[in-house]
Swiss-Prot record:
<dbReference type="Pfam" id="PF02374">
    <property type="entry name" value="ArsA_ATPase"/>
</dbReference>
<dbReference type="GO" id="GO:0071816">
    <property type="term" value="P:tail-anchored membrane protein insertion into ER membrane"/>
</dbReference>
<dbReference type="InterPro" id="IPR027542">
    <property type="entry name" value="ATPase_ArsA/GET3_euk"/>
</dbReference>
<comment type="similarity">
    <text>Belongs to the arsA ATPase family.</text>
</comment>
<feature type="binding site">
    <location>
        <position position="285"/>
    </location>
    <ligand>
        <name>Zn(2+)</name>
    </ligand>
</feature>
<dbReference type="GO" id="GO:0046872">
    <property type="term" value="F:metal ion binding"/>
</dbReference>
<feature type="binding site">
    <location>
        <position position="271"/>
    </location>
    <ligand>
        <name>ATP</name>
    </ligand>
</feature>
<keyword id="KW-0547">Nucleotide-binding</keyword>
<feature type="active site">
    <location>
        <position position="61"/>
    </location>
</feature>
<dbReference type="GO" id="GO:0016887">
    <property type="term" value="F:ATP hydrolysis activity"/>
</dbReference>
<keyword id="KW-0862">Zinc</keyword>
<dbReference type="GO" id="GO:0042802">
    <property type="term" value="F:identical protein binding"/>
</dbReference>
<keyword id="KW-0067">ATP-binding</keyword>
<protein>
    <recommendedName>
        <fullName>ATPase GET3</fullName>
        <ecNumber>3.6.-.-</ecNumber>
    </recommendedName>
</protein>
<feature type="binding site">
    <location>
        <begin position="32"/>
        <end position="39"/>
    </location>
    <ligand>
        <name>ATP</name>
    </ligand>
</feature>
<comment type="function">
    <text>ATPase required for the post-translational delivery of tail-anchored (TA) proteins to the endoplasmic reticulum. Recognizes and selectively binds the transmembrane domain of TA proteins in the cytosol. This complex then targets to the endoplasmic reticulum by membrane-bound receptors, where the tail-anchored protein is released for insertion. This process is regulated by ATP binding and hydrolysis. ATP binding drives the homodimer towards the closed dimer state, facilitating recognition of newly synthesized TA membrane proteins. ATP hydrolysis is required for insertion.</text>
</comment>
<keyword id="KW-0963">Cytoplasm</keyword>
Length: 326
């Protein structure tokens, strides 16, 4: 089916412009679930490690895949990837992050708030019920750790689109959370003081005012880094999709949202493309290529000013340093 055929020359665009942009400090890789975000972010991180002194790859997806991609266990602390001396990776647990913030370190957040009895349980339930708070606290933990580290460029392997958009709304969520805490403090101040006992402290030494102060300090860090996120010289977002309707729909939605957040995006990676083989005719393959061609043309028409990178469907899994590097 000649009209559906895609030739190798169509695959020329690459992510080389991102590698060449030496000012970049933050790179986000995101898209619909199952389109190859982790593979793309891992491959990009490996290539960046050839051009930069130090690179950090962070997974903010609750269903972490970095460990599977590199055949190496990662956790909430940055760890060098086997075979590299300048490429590290870490996986953030958003639920753990909010508990650490509530506790201020040491004991768990649940133990800290338990000292307030029923009032503590209500405040903890409130914190967890604020829309997007898990993504926000994950973001806060990332920034806190990044602030104390020294990496030339940081790549975020993000969660599927909906989570990622909430993840990028952190400043707004933080404002709402602080507003709720302040409102509760004013409304239930006398009642809280009667629960707290001498010195206005919880049994474990934690103080509600100290909690609020820590959240305010964290907001200051967020404000600083958020300014960098809106700087196209420092930050870009790589959209990953496949040539299908739902993926294209989510990509458009994400790009519109990124524009509203003032976050630069000019690269789209289209994965799982089928290419014709002359000696292996396949009716299903031809039908799928025809469908892919239709959506690929729509992508090129919609995003004619974008760098559209086309990647073929591979015959085997992309796992391990060698395959990711290719």
């Amino acid at each position: 089916m000649a009209s559906a055929a895609l030739i190798d020359s169509d695959m020329e665009p690459t992510l080389q412009p991102i590698l060449d942009q030496k000012t970049l400090r933050w790179i986000f890789v995101g898209g619909k679930g199952g389109v190859g975000k982790t593979t793309t972010s891992c491959s990009l991180a490996i290539q960046l490690a050839k051009h930069r002194k130090s690179v950090l790859l962070i997974s903010t997806d609750p269903a972490h895949n970095l460990s599977d991609a590199f055949n190496q266990k990662f956790g909430k602390d940055a760890r060098l990837i086997n075979g590299f001396d300048n490429l590290s990776a870490m996986e953030i647990d958003p639920n753990g992050s909010i508990q650490d913030l509530l506790a201020g370190g040491g004991e768990s957040g649940e133990d800290a708030m338990a000292g307030l009895g029923g009032m503590g349980n209500m405040m903890q339930d409130l914190a967890f019920s604020i829309p997007g708070v898990d993504e926000a606290m994950s973001f806060a933990e990332v920034l806190k750790q990044v602030k104390s580290m020294s990496y030339e460029v940081i790549i975020f392997d993000t969660a599927p689109t909906g989570h990622t958009l909430r993840f990028l709304q952190f400043p707004t969520v933080m404002e709402k959370a602080l507003s709720k805490v302040s409102q509760l403090s004013r409304q239930f101040g006398p009642m809280l003081n009667s629960f707290l006992g001498g010195g206005g402290r919880l049994p474990n030494g934690q103080n509600i005012d100290e909690l609020v102060e820590k959240m305010e300090a964290l907001r200051g860090t967020i404000s600083e880094v958020n300014g960098q996120f809106k700087d196209a010289d420092l930050t870009t977002f790589v959209c990953v999709c496949i040539p299908e309707f739902l993926s294209l729909y989510e990509t458009e939605r994400m790009i519109q949202e990124l524009n509203s957040y003032e976050i630069d995006t000019h690269s789209i990676v289209v994965n799982q493309l089928l290419f014709p083989k002359q000696d292996n005719p396949c009716e299903q393959c031809n039908a799928r290529r025809k469908m892919q061609k239709k959506y690929l043309e729509q992508i090129e028409e919609l995003y004619d000013e974008f760098n559209v990178v086309k990647m073929p469907l591979l015959v085997e899994e992309v796992r391990g340093k060698e395959k990711l590097e290719k």
